[in-house]
Amino acid sequence: MAIILITKNLEEEINKKFKKESIKIFEHIYSLKENPKKGKEIGVVGGILIKELKHKNHRFYFLVDGYKIKILSIKELSNCVLKFVRMSDKNTQQKVINEIKDILRKIGEEHFT
């Protein structure tokens, strides 16, 4: 099983915005433990793959080691870490993707805590 990490800021944002529905969203996110290859690839910055997971009109962005996710089988991805960092709706999708890429280029993954 993969390891799922959600930044504190994103967790608070999900709970604030979705209230009761946040339980379903977290279940959807944690379903990646069993199938870490789920989600749409958005881009790669320095070997870090940016992917999105959709839930209705919202997208949740996570970072993963691009080499592991592409090469290893699902069974071999037991120590793979998926780090959820941001959320957007359809209107702000491209802006958020560009922000994630910019942060990864300038500062690196450590900025997302």
Predicted regions and their residues:
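A short, surface-exposed loop/turn module that caps and links secondary-structure elements
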Residues: I29-K54
